[in-house]
Amino acid sequence: MTDVTVKSLAAEIQTPVDRLVQQFADAGIDKTAVDSVTQQEKETLLAHLNRDRGAAPNKLTLQRKTRSTLNIPSTGGKSKSVQIEVRKKRTYVQRDPQAQEQAEAEEQARREAEELAQHQVQRDAEEKAKRAAEDKAKREAAEQAKRVAAESDKLTNQQTNTMTKSPQATEKARREAEAAELRRKAEEETRRKVEEKARQVAEEARRMAEERGGNWDNAPEPAEEDTTDYHVNTSHHAREAEDENDRKVEGDRRSRTRGGKATKQKKTSRLSESKADREEARAVGRGGKGKRRPSTLTQGFNKPAQAVNRDVVIGETITVAELANKMAVKGSQVIKAMMKLGAMATINQVIDQETAQLVAEEMGHKVILRRENELEESVMSDRDTGSSAAAESRAPVVTIMGHVDHGKTSLLDYIRSTKVAAGEAGGITQHIGAYHVETDNGMITFLDTPGHAAFTAMRARGAQATDIVVLVVAADDGVMPQTIEAIQHAKAAKVPVVVAVNKIDKPEADPDRVKNELTQYGVIPEEWGGESQFVHVSAKSGAGIDELLDAILLQAEVLELKAIRNGMASGVVIESFLDKGRGPVATVLVREGTLNRGDIVLCGFEYGRVRAMRDEVGRDVASAGPSIPVEILGLSGVPAAGDEATVVRDEKKAREVALYRQGKFREVKLARQQKSKLENMFANMTEGEVSELNIVLKSDVQGSAEAISDALEKLSNDEVKVKIVGSGVGGITETDATLAAASNAILLGFNVRADASARRVIEAENLDLRYYSVIYDLIDEVKQAMSGMLAPEYKQEIIGLAEVRNVFRSPKFGAIAGCMVTEGVVKRHNKIRVLRENVVIYEGELESLRRFKDDVNEVRNGMECGIGVKNYNDVRSGDVIEVFETIEIQRTIA
């Protein structure tokens, strides 16, 4: 037969040559690719491969995953599904026959060692007992010898020796009993220790055998020559292991459901527990009193015995429901707490910060007050305002005020027309309310505000936009009410006043009279020892204009006005309007910094990016420094006069701040317009509703106000009540007008007048405003107003009588009474009464009145007529028809 080489054998069995060479080497045969292979070598290689393939694995690891869904209840009564994955890993080890033989040999050696140790212990115990017996015999012999010697030596003391011997024998017997008991206890302790040690060794050996053998102890080992059943045996063992694992897991689950860990411990450690221990474990597993323990799926925590104190964050306003949610309590508990504090509220009602703080602290929580304008503060703080050390001198901002027709407008027009360059004359029509004038000594910015209302609003908002007030007083007219109001506003703002005595060119001018009158209000000239400069000017001829400008600049130099030119700009809105082509336009007077085109401006409720800037003559400018008025375009809406304009970094944050301001303004407005409370509603639901005449009273002095209030309240009666909504001393302000509009009241001014802002509100709301200088005139007009609110009286007046002479029948009107007018006049469609024997039997309306077949409107005394009574046909001859009319009598208050 041809020799088979390793290479040809590899090609025949379709395996690489290198692998076949390696397999020969593993079988102990050294071959190369060109060496020949004999039949015996082939059989040797096949036997080697069969042994390798037929060897079952000693260890098998099974990993199983179990997925399930658990529904967990959450807040709000809803449940949440949670995906749960349980991973189990079991490792099964097959016992090695050699290891089993070795373990059996070790077990045999251990048992022999235990038997040897037990025999040794028994021998030691026997020897110890033998030595104890010998010692006992020796002691007894010695005692006997002593006893004999004592009897022979002391015959005289036999009785005494006998008495002494008895307790010695008793003590000897007691000692022997104690020694025997100790020997018995020692033997029992030794035997118990040996048995315990043997039991522990046996238990450890059994546990090790179970770990080594696992569940494969009884599995038949595969035959050495059987290589085809390898996968079948492996899968069979795996299935058995999985089934056993499933049974074990199911048993654990059932044991947990029935009794928890105590039951499981009872089952697993039954071999090592006594019967009493098992009974005790069974009692514990059933709850101690024979009751079934609850399922482990129930909640393992109890309701807290103490209330949980929380940190409650409260803003400026909060609803009752939100407050209850933050304290983790029900809304009804919060309402109960508020009722205990004396406040009634619903669950959706908005309460203020103080009330919410009291309620939260009453319920034992810690309150953290939060300012809702934190964003606004952060936006304002994140601004580059420049260094205060780099402050430079700036132009003064001058507001010209004065009474109507005192030449204020003419003075402004003259200054503007003479100081504005000729090339800029065409831009005068672009009047924006503010402009600056260049003089030889410096620049001055004038504010042309419409009256003093805008000036007051600016001072109230702390704009600090006005530095100097020029008070214009006509030399021929003197001090007037608006002049006094201007002085009061200037003093309230702590702004210096420069007095311009206008119309000095008139023949009737009297400058000294103006000085005397102004002195009464605290404006004292410098030549009289005061601080106010007085300049005589004429807006018509231009006399004294330069002196006025010099006085303004001198006052500004004394004030040392400075501003930071670098950094983000801030200013105040002088006026604003809506232009059709350009949108919202605002006139801004820059106070600090530099306003550039493209800056983001936050202005009151509005915001936006500056798209264009123009000066007072309509020219486009790229930037504006301090004390320069400019028109800006690009805001989201028309801002209010007096609002502060601020340049910020982030347009998004500017929008949020503007929206927050709008929301707060809306809340305040709605709160002011809130309807009457429940108590007022019940108070108004009384029988015979009493009319109320609401009055807002302003007087010049407090005594007059009290006297008028008492006199008006005494005019009240059962039908009309006079209610003084508000009273005070001083002029009628915008607040008074707003109060009168809200309460539907009449404004009464006693020796006082309303200012411009109040007049605007009065005109807009169409309020009733009356001025008085005599208290009696005021009381009489209030009486007339109350009389108009009284219910009128009605009186029936008889205007005619007609006697029925005959009765006719008409197909159209029924019974027609032929009558003779005996008194007065009978008129058609008037009310009538039918009297029979001076008793009223019917009251109705006269429907038809005829004379000689002609319809007439009236029939006078002594004439005959036919009368048809509406809806009444029982008219008889001899009846009297009484014609009357109802007259309304206007009531008056005495």
Swiss-Prot record:
Binding positions for GTP per the UniProt entry: 402-409, 448-452, 502-505
Region (G4): 502-505
GO molecular-function terms, A-Z: GTP binding; GTPase activity; guanosine tetraphosphate binding; translation initiation factor activity
Identification of the protein by name: Translation initiation factor IF-2
Region spans: G1: 402-409
InterPro entries: DNA-bd_dom_put_sf, EF-G-like_DII, EFTu-like_2, IF2_assoc_dom_bac, IF2_II, IF2_N, P-loop_NTPase, Small_GTP-bd
Span list, region G5: 538-540
Annotated segments matching region Disordered: 52-301
Ranges of Polar residues composition bias in the record: 68-82, 155-168
Organism, as annotated: Sodalis glossinidius (strain morsitans)
UniProt subcellular location: Cytoplasm
Region (G2): 427-431
GO cellular component: cytosol
Keywords for the protein's UniProt record, in alphabetical order: Cytoplasm, GTP-binding, Initiation factor, Nucleotide-binding, Protein biosynthesis
Biased composition regions of type Basic residues, renumbered to the chain: 255-269
Function per UniProt: One of the essential components for the initiation of protein synthesis. Protects formylmethionyl-tRNA from spontaneous hydrolysis and promotes its binding to the 30S ribosomal subunits. Also involved in the hydrolysis of GTP during the formation of the 70S ribosomal complex.
Region feature (G3): 448-451
